[in-house]
Amino acid sequence: LYPADKDVRSICFTDRPIETNGWETVIVERRFSDPRRESRMYKILAHQWFQNTASSLWIDGNCELLVSSSELFAFLEKVDIVMPRHPTNKTLTDEAELIVKLNKAPTEQVQKQMAHYPNHNLPIGATSWLLRNHTNTISSLNEAWWSELTVHTLRDQLSLPYCLDRFKISPYLIDVDLYNNKLVRVHPHRGVG
């Protein structure tokens, strides 16, 4: 893990003891055999793990904060959910096509999921880092988002726009280069070819 921001409570959920570079470690018992589903549960259902917290920032394990998290939390003053704009995909259709092209999920599952979504032109964000206020509406959004992942593919960027639209939530999609910006650096995943 990259160094934790010392100005906020930084928590790492893990199923085994690891060196965390300043993070508070919460050892959890695995609930799912698929580690992707496991990590997405903590990512999506943040309101369940941080019930007495006004807001939270999720960052994937391959992300490094380049600014204090207070700079990022400032984005939440006017909206309840913030993430970077997707670097290549503009719409849900673009995301679905890329998922199929890169074999990130079975084509049939992606097609079935897209058939379930009435609007394919929804804007898409990248969810490698995600800021949320813990409002009742955002908690309901999180639950619906998790439900989509239990019914359809595990591709969270595919299901989130549908849920945002369903709850009439307009996220703030920050216009930054996901891989080269002054806020959060996204590094290549280790051990992934």
Tell what function each PLM region has:
Residues 1-193:
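Glycosyltransferase catalytic domains, chiefly GT-A lineage
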